[in-house]
Amino acid sequence: MAITTDPSITSKSANCRGGDAIELSCIGEDGARYNARMYTPQAGIFALGTSSHTYLEFDILDVKKSKEFASTISAIREPRTTTGGVNFVIGFRPELWRDIVPEDAPPGVAGFNKEIQGKEGFVMPGTQHDALVWLSGSAYDVIFDMARSIVHDLAGQASLGEETASWSYQHDRDLTGFVDGSENPTLLDAPAAALLPEGFPGAAGSVLLLQKWKHKTTEWEALPIDQQERIMGRTKPDSIELENKPADSHVARTDQDEFGHIFRRNMPYGRVDDHGTMFVGFSADQKRLSGMLDSMAGLINGTRDALTRFTQPLTGSYYFVPSVETLRRLR
C-alpha cells in the first residue's frame, strides 16, 4: 500500500513509547488515517570521509546488571557527530539487546556464537562480545582521548575484550592495493540497504558484522598483478569487474545481486609486520551477511573464496545497532 501524508496535519515530536520519534499522521490509498513513527539511524553509520577509527568491544561483568550497562553505554555521548569531531556507533549483542528492549529487537538476529567451518579446513571464528563502540573522526588524538574516556566510564560494568585502531589507506583502498567497497550503494541508497524499515521492530537500526582479517602480505605481493585480479575478480588500477571472472573470485563469491545489498565501512588496521582489514558491514537483513560468509567459506556450492587463501579471519561478531531514539530511552 502506498502512503501519502496529509498536508493539513503537522508532524510533531511525540513523547511516546520508543523514544522521541517523529510521529506523522498519514492517509493510505484506502482513505484510512493512521499514525506512523519515524526513527533516526545513528549518524556514524554513514559518516564517510573519516580517516581515524577505533573499535572497542566490551564484555559485561555481571549479566544481572545488563540494563545498567546499557544505560551507561547509551549515555556516553549523543550517537551523532560531536563538537569534538568524533562519530559514535553503539551496538549490542543481538541476544543481549533482545533481553533489554525486546520490542525493538528484530526477530531471528543472532550473535556470531559459533565458528563457520568451511571447505579445506578453512575456519571463520566466532568471538562474540556483548557491546561495541565504534569511534571515527579525522584526528586520531581525539579518537584516542574519547576511547580512554569510554573505557573509564564503563569500568566496573564491563571489561574491554577487543580494541583495534584503523585508518584510511590511499583514499579508498585496502592493504591488498585494491579499491574496497566498489559495490557500495550511494549515500542516497545506503539507508535502504543498511536499515530496518519503519513499522518493523528495530526500525532505523542495523545489523552489523565486524570481523578482523589478517593479510598474508608476503604471499599476496609475490603474485603477479593479473593473478591478483583473477582472485579479486576486478582490475587493480580502476576496480572494473572482470567480464570472465573465475567462480572462486572474491567478487563472484560475494555477489550482492545474489545475496542482497549491504553497506560496507571497511578499514585497514595494524602494524608493518601484522596488518589487514577490519570488515564493517551493515545490513537490514542478517541473512545477507551470513550468506556471504557461507559462500566465502565454500558452504554454498563447494567453491571457496580464493581470497581466503591470502587472508585469515581472526575475529567475528554481530551487533544490533539501534536507532537514536531507542538509545535515548535507555539513559
Where are these regions (language model features)?
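Short, positively charged and aromatic/hydrophobic N-terminal segments
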Residues: A21-I22, I27, R33-Y34
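A residue-level detector for conformationally permissive "hinge/kink" positions
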Residues: T10-S11, E23, P268
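Long, histidine/aromatic-enriched segments associated with O2/redox biology
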Residues: Y34-R331
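Ser/Thr-rich, low-complexity intrinsically disordered segments
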Residues: M1-S13, A32
